[in-house]
Amino acid sequence: MTARELSIAGAWEITPVLRTDSRGLFFEWFTDAGFTEFAGHQFDMRQANCSVSARGVLRGVHFAQVPPSQAKYVTCVRGAVFDVVVDIRVGSPTFGQWDAVLLDDKDRRSIYISEGLGHAFLALDDDSTVMYLCSAPYAPQREHTVRPTDFGIEWPEVPELILSDRDAQAPSLAEAQAAGVLPTWADCQAFVETLRRNLVS
């Protein structure tokens, strides 16, 4: 597999090697060695999730408080999603900016979203199925959302956007910052550095 860091520090697009024959397809979508090589630390998986979405479903922008937040390693095993990472780390050089990757069941790419970053995706096909590896269990009291239409994200056109009440009524980035719920660049950098020190030790 190969990894390409996105324009948002701490986010990577991972492209696997696809091996096909008369039986079908095989590929490695995650390896500990491959992850450690690009991230500089191991991925401590604590939970695995699966979501199935109709075309037009928009989930996000979601994030968790740091520490420990919740890093995510995400792939799409059926259909296609426009997967977005948003920099919500106050003090970051790219604060308020976004980048995106197409995840689908053809190229089989994944995206890694490190602690403190915001995550969202738009389902482009019915029954789009997304698998997440998560570095921390779901903790609703530490989970937050920011309005997904607040970042100038160039969402692909779909007949109708479908959002949960929580996401549709989420605060703007400015409102979330004023409420003091956004992570800081310094806290995120410090947390990731502890993960890297643990690898060395």
Swiss-Prot record:
InterPro entries for the chain: RmlC-like (IPR000888), RmlC-like_jellyroll (IPR014710), RmlC_Cupin_sf (IPR011051)
Record keyword Cytoplasm present: no
Pfam families per UniProt: dTDP_sugar_isom
Catalytic activities: dTDP-4-dehydro-6-deoxy-alpha-D-glucose = dTDP-4-dehydro-beta-L-rhamnose
One Gene Ontology CC term in the entry: cytosol
Molecular function in Gene Ontology: dTDP-4-dehydrorhamnose 3,5-epimerase activity
Alphabetical GO biological process terms: dTDP-rhamnose biosynthetic process; polysaccharide biosynthetic process
Entry's EC annotation: 5.1.3.13
Binding site for substrate: R23, E28, Q47, A48, N49, R59, K72, H119, E143, R166
Residues of the active site: H62 (proton acceptor), Y132 (proton donor)
Entry keyword set: Carbohydrate metabolism, Isomerase
Pathway: Carbohydrate biosynthesis; dTDP-L-rhamnose biosynthesis
Residues flagged as site, Participates in a stacking interaction with the thymidine ring of dTDP-4-oxo-6-deoxyglucose: Y138
Function: Catalyzes the epimerization of the C3' and C5'positions of dTDP-6-deoxy-D-xylo-4-hexulose, forming dTDP-6-deoxy-L-lyxo-4-hexulose. Involved in the biosynthesis of the dTDP-L-rhamnose which is a component of the critical linker, D-N-acetylglucosamine-L-rhamnose disaccharide, which connects the galactan region of arabinogalactan to peptidoglycan via a phosphodiester linkage.
Quaternary organization: Homodimer.
Family the UniProt entry places it in: Belongs to the dTDP-4-dehydrorhamnose 3,5-epimerase family.
Protein name according to UniProt: dTDP-4-dehydrorhamnose 3,5-epimerase
Species of the source: Mycolicibacterium smegmatis (strain ATCC 700084 / mc(2)155)
Lineage of the organism: Bacteria, Bacillati, Actinomycetota, Actinomycetes, Mycobacteriales
Gene name of the encoded protein: rmlC
